[in-house]
Swiss-Prot record:
Transmembrane segments: none annotated. GO terms for biological process: translation. It comes from Rickettsia peacockii (strain Rustic). CDD domains: Ribosomal_S15p_S13e. Part of the 30S ribosomal subunit. Forms a bridge to the 50S subunit in the 70S ribosome, contacting the 23S rRNA. This is Small ribosomal subunit protein uS15. Pfam families: Ribosomal_S15. GO terms for cellular component: cytosolic small ribosomal subunit. GO terms for molecular function: rRNA binding; structural constituent of ribosome. One of the primary rRNA binding proteins, it binds directly to 16S rRNA where it helps nucleate assembly of the platform of the 30S subunit by binding and bridging several RNA helices of the 16S rRNA. It comes from the Bacteria. Keywords: Ribonucleoprotein, Ribosomal protein, RNA-binding, rRNA-binding. The gene is rpsO. SMART domains: Ribosomal_S15. InterPro entries: Ribosomal_uS15 (IPR000589), Ribosomal_uS15_bac-type (IPR005290), uS15_NS1_RNA-bd_sf (IPR009068).
Length: 91
């Protein structure tokens, strides 16, 4: 259900702006998207897991706030990021 260290390092390497970048908003958004996708798969077989569903909603809200920040500061970066992550635009 959680992300493996190797997968997280791969995401950091793919979305990092500089070599040692681990905390930029794009990297955080990519990691959150991976966690959200993992939880979504978990709910396909565990539909009564309401505690984890609340955690999923918290993660989705955190990702939405990060995407709003990116959109406010750099629209082209935002559009590129959502196309790479495969998520919809925020209204």
């Amino acid at each position: 259900m959680s992300i493996t260290t190797e997968r997280k390092q791969k995401l950091i390497k793919e979305y990092a702006i500089t070599e040692n970048d681990t905390g930029s908003s794009a990297v955080q958004c990519a990691i959150l998207t991976e966690r959200i996708n993992n939880l979504t798969e978990h709910f396909k077989s565990n539909h009564k897991d309401h505690t984890s569903r609340r955690g999923l909603l918290i993660l989705v809200g955190r990702r939405r706030r990060l995407l709003n920040y990116i959109k406010k500061n750099n629209v082209s970066k935002y559009l590129d990021l959502i196309s790479k992550l495969g998520i919809r635009k925020i209204k």
